[in-house]
Amino acid sequence: MTTNAGPLHPYWPQHLRLDNFVPNDRPTWHILAGLFSVTGVLVVTTWLLSGRAAVVPLGTWRRLSLCWFAVCGFIHLVIEGWFVLYYEDLLGDQAFLSQLWKEYAKGDSRYILGDNFTVCMETITACLWGPLSLWVVIAFLRQHPLRFILQLVVSVGQIYGDVLYFLTEHRDGFQHGELGHPLYFWFYFVFMNALWLVLPGVLVLDAVKHLTHAQSTLDAKATKAKSKKN
């Protein structure tokens, strides 16, 4: 990107020259309402499904965790998958998801600059954590023995990617957004991404707890069987 004396876009650094930029024709509230409406419908649908389709009854916490993984599957596969496919065309495209990314990029312009780390990180997220998030939901509904391992793998992967996401921007001096802006910095950049540190962190502890208990039970049975032989 080259510099431009008079920026005609809302992105940072303000000297960026974005010749192909086309402003969104949808207001911010419209974009956010669309995103959160779809997310809300998905949460309600997953909640109802987890109460009816599970092989064994699931508790409130487990059903809420499945709602989280369903939302993750949607965001990783659809929204981030869109970015992976069309990141080179976002600036001039007016499809809803392109406008969503142009709106989010006001808090992190790496998404409209084709930043190498961002593209690679989002590709891994869309291709791995998206499908695996949906597999977590199915695994818990079916009581699959891999369910807590899948939960652990996905959650650790999400935390790892999110930590790198924050640290790379920190090392760049937070130059890709307006530092301290209540919406673009604190809500888009900090809060929305911090969710993928806090919730996966809780789910990692949950998975470790159950896997540790299962291993302890197996070890106890093995010890008991060995003592009987002796």
Swiss-Prot record:
It is a multi-pass membrane protein. It catalyses: lathosterol = 5alpha-cholest-8-en-3beta-ol; zymosterol = 5alpha-cholesta-7,24-dien-3beta-ol; 5,6alpha-epoxy-5alpha-cholestan-3beta-ol + H2O = 5alpha-cholestane-3beta,5,6beta-triol; 5,6beta-epoxy-5beta-cholestan-3beta-ol + H2O = 5alpha-cholestane-3beta,5,6beta-triol. Signal peptide: none annotated. Cholestenol Delta-isomerase and cholesterol-5,6-epoxide hydrolase (ChEH) activities are inhibited by tamoxifen and the selective AEBS ligand (4-benzyl-phenoxy)-ethyl-N-pyrrolidine (PBPE). ChEH activity is inhibited by oleic acid. Its EC number is 5.3.3.5, 3.3.2.11. It holds the Pfam family EBP. Residues 61-204 form the EXPERA domain. GO terms for biological process: cholesterol biosynthetic process; cholesterol biosynthetic process via desmosterol; cholesterol biosynthetic process via lathosterol; cholesterol metabolic process; hemopoiesis; ossification involved in bone maturation. One of its GO terms (cellular component) is nuclear envelope. Pathway: Steroid biosynthesis; cholesterol biosynthesis. It is found in: Endoplasmic reticulum membrane; Nucleus envelope; Cytoplasmic vesicle. Keywords: Acetylation, Cataract, Cholesterol biosynthesis, Cholesterol metabolism, Cytoplasmic vesicle, Disease variant, Dwarfism, Endoplasmic reticulum, Hydrolase, Ichthyosis, Isomerase, Lipid biosynthesis, Lipid metabolism, Membrane, Nucleus, Steroid biosynthesis, Steroid metabolism, Sterol biosynthesis, Sterol metabolism, Transmembrane, Transmembrane helix. Changing I75N: In MEND; patients have increased plasma levels of 8(9)-cholestenol; probable hypomorphic mutation. Its main location: endoplasmic reticulum. It comes from the Eukaryota. The modification N-acetylthreonine is found at T2. Changing E122A: Reduces catalytic activity to less than 10% of wild-type. PANTHER family: 3-BETA-HYDROXYSTEROID-DELTA(8),DELTA(7)-ISOMERASE (PTHR14207:SF0), STEROL ISOMERASE (PTHR14207). It is linked to Chondrodysplasia punctata 2, X-linked dominant: A clinically and genetically heterogeneous disorder characterized by punctiform calcification of the bones. The key clinical features of CDPX2 are chondrodysplasia punctata, linear ichthyosis, cataracts and short stature. CDPX2 is a rare disorder of defective cholesterol biosynthesis, biochemically characterized by an increased amount of 8-dehydrocholesterol and cholest-8(9)-en-3-beta-ol in the plasma and tissues. MEND syndrome: An X-linked recessive disorder associated with a defect in sterol biosynthesis. Disease manifestations and severity are highly variable. Clinical features include intellectual disability, short stature, scoliosis, digital abnormalities, cataracts, and dermatologic abnormalities. Belongs to the EBP family. Isomerase that catalyzes the conversion of Delta(8)-sterols to their corresponding Delta(7)-isomers a catalytic step in the postlanosterol biosynthesis of cholesterol. Component of the microsomal antiestrogen binding site (AEBS), a multiproteic complex at the ER membrane that consists of an association between EBP and 7-dehydrocholesterol reductase/DHCR7. This complex is responsible for cholesterol-5,6-epoxide hydrolase (ChEH) activity, which consists in the hydration of cholesterol-5,6-epoxides (5,6-EC) into cholestane-3beta,5alpha,6beta-triol (CT). The precise role of each component of this complex has not been described yet. This is 3-beta-hydroxysteroid-Delta(8),Delta(7)-isomerase. It comes from Homo sapiens.
